[in-house]
């Protein structure tokens, strides 16, 4: 007669083992980097990462330590409105241009790192473009100037 050996595994260890196996079996779900567009802001080239989802817009440029000289982020809002930006958890000084649905810059504001101040659009904005602080001023870009290459409104 064969002997049957029973092994007792403590419940906590079995739970940990099951969790570890599930973690390795689950497919990796790394967040894909935002896609980027090549914009022309009053004729000046700007590579802009696109923040089109609520999650992407909420994160924005938070925790970024650097931004290329001609790089930025394009925020695409679901509806035109008096949208506002803040600098929570954002270590870079930035400028923001609010843009209407026709691609016309409504206003441009400078923003300081790690502040909770609200920086608001001067009119119904469909987009906002964040760049390194002073990017618009250095190129003499002003309200009324046009942005080309924006994604079409829904």
Q: What are the residue ranges of the model-derived segments?
A:
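Short, flexible active-site loop motifs that bind/organize anionic cofactors or intermediates
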Residues: 2, 20, 126
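Compact, glycine-rich, soluble single-domain proteins
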Residues: 31-154
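Bacterial N-terminal signal peptides
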Residues: 13-24
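N-terminal regions of proteins, emphasizing targeting and processing segments when present
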Residues: 8-13, 45
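A generic structured-segment signal
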Residues: 8, 24, 145-147
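Sec/Tat signal peptide C-region and signal peptidase I cleavage site
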Residues: 26-30
């Amino acid at each position: 007669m064969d002997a049957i050996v029973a092994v007792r595994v403590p419940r906590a260890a079995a739970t940990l083992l099951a969790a570890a196996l599930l973690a390795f079996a689950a497919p990796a779900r790394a967040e894909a980097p935002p896609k980027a567009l090549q914009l022309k802001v009053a004729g000046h080239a700007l590579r802009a990462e696109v923040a089109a989802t609520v999650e992407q817009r909420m994160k924005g440029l938070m925790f970024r330590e650097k931004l290329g000289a001609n790089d930025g982020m394009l925020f695409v809002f679901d509806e035109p409105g008096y949208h506002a930006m803040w600098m929570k958890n954002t270590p870079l000084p930035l400028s923001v241009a609010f843009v209407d649905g026709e691609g016309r810059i409504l206003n441009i504001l400078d923003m300081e790192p790690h502040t909770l101040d609200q920086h608001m659009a001067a009119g119904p904005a469909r987009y906002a473009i964040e760049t390194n602080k002073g990017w618009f001023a250095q190129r003499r870009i002003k309200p009324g100037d046009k942005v080309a290459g924006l994604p079409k409104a829904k």
